[in-house]
Amino acid sequence: MMDERAAWLTQGKGATPDLRWSFSTEAPLSALDLARETGEILAADVSGGLYLLDRQGQFLHLNRGIKDVQLVHWSDRGKLGAAIYSNNNICCFDRDLNVLWAISFSVECLAISMDSYGDYIAVSLASGKTIIIDSQKRKIASIETIRPLSYLQFQVTEPRLIGAAENGLLCCYDLEGNCLWTEKHWSNCGGIATAGDGHRIYLAGFNYGILMFDHDGETAGTLVFEGTPKVIDCDFSANRIVAATIEQELYWLNQEGKLLWGGVIPDEAIEVACDPFGQWCVCGMKSGLVQCLDWSDAI
């Protein structure tokens, strides 16, 4: 008998994925992240619950002590995590979700990211500053941009931080705070995804589709499809892209933008994440339902 939670997958177009697992948070979902190496999922809900799941969707740890979490990041090796909470605070926590330290800022925090090893954390502020901190809470660098950065990602293979503003700006910095390149564009941005080696950078460009850039920030084209992408992710090699749209649809695409599968999501997507090999993705919905969709048998 089919799991009712998988029924929406069979109504899509293309190669139907298997539902590998489902998990529900106890309150509406507020944030989600995937560790590419361990396959672990970190999720937060609006009641203050912080959940760590293994790659099979099995519950590992729970912390209820961090209230009003807006964004989370879990290092690819599963060593440490970080979160923005209560608008202008960040914290760093260990594998058991025990808080190691916290910092309060005088302005709102917009984005947070952690490098693959859990050694560095970057946080962007509404003032236009982005701060790089190490795992021991020491400030490493301070960056100022012409617009506040709403999205941050560390590159895996090089010590680089890639950031994007809500509109008109994509940039790249080294870990000493030196600007490597800046690229202006003409679209609002709803999310960012990067290949592991940085050779491809994607921006969810809303009505403009998915904007593509290369390792040096040069425009590399646009992927246009039905719907208005708002959150996206890609695998390590950028061969697979997962995108959720404002119209409440989910798309699984190849690197050329060809639709491999698409369907209507039961609820608004808060975040999507793709495994490093492009075989499965995780979709976190506002209701608190988190599902892993698996195409490995279709490859």
Task: Write out the residue ranges for each language-model feature.
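A short helix->beta-strand "capping" segment at the edge of beta-propeller domains
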Residues: 2-28, 56
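A short beta-strand motif characteristic of beta-propeller blades
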Residues: 18-23, 58-63, 98-103, 138-144, ...
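Beta-strand-rich domains and repeat architectures in extracellular enzymes and scaffolds
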Residues: 21-48
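Hydrophobic core register within WD40 beta-propeller blades
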Residues: 32, 72, 112-114, 152, ...
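Residue-level detector of Asp-centered blade-edge/turn motifs that repeat once per structural unit
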Residues: 36-38, 76-77, 116-117, 156-158, ...
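Hydrophobic beta-strand positions that form the internal "hydrophobic ladder"
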Residues: 41, 80-81, 121, 161, ...
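WD40 beta-propeller blade core
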Residues: 51, 90-91, 131, 171-172, ...
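Blade-level signature of beta-propeller repeat domains, shared across WD40, Kelch, NHL, RCC1
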Residues: 267-299
